[in-house]
Amino acid sequence: MRKIRKNIATRQVIHIVGEGLTELFYFSHLKKLLGYRYSISPRLFENNSIEKIEKKIKELLDEDVFVICVFDDDVSRRSDAENRKMTALKKKYENNANVILCDSLQSIEYWFLLQFEDTCRHFQDSAATERALKQYLSTYDKTRKYLEKDKWVRDMLADSKIQKACELAEKYKGRDSYSEIYKAIQKVSE
């Protein structure tokens, strides 16, 4: 007699790529602390250019992987050439159901700030955003030594701050300061 097999829904693999150590450690800590299921390639987070990010997205899509790409948009504002590349990348993947591009302006620190403060004010640069964040995380530092410890992420997760940040980020979408990291959080929380 033939064995009846149940159809078990398989979950598509989610892979996060990004451009810096802050993003790498943030998502690594979230995975560990909240039990999120995704993969991260640490070597893909160090000084990535837009070209390298795009190449990795294509490779992952060819493997039928859902891709979440996290980066700071201030990089594209520094030169017209970088801005054109970033605009082309966004346009290329804006309607792709297997890619979420999560940029933040000025930087990911704006996303962190939303965990503590309801703000959409314009920040001149990422340093200004970091100064505002230090009002809440006084020891915040972008060094590997600081980032590899998970205390700073634990502090942001306390009191359901991440849900509040998601609501605020969605509310302020398209403003002078914004972060689309809420899309990544929503996806990995499914």
Question: Residues of each region from the PLM?
Answer:
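C-terminal accessory helical subdomains adjacent to catalytic cores in phosphodiester-
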Residues: 2-11, 24-43, 54-66, 73-190
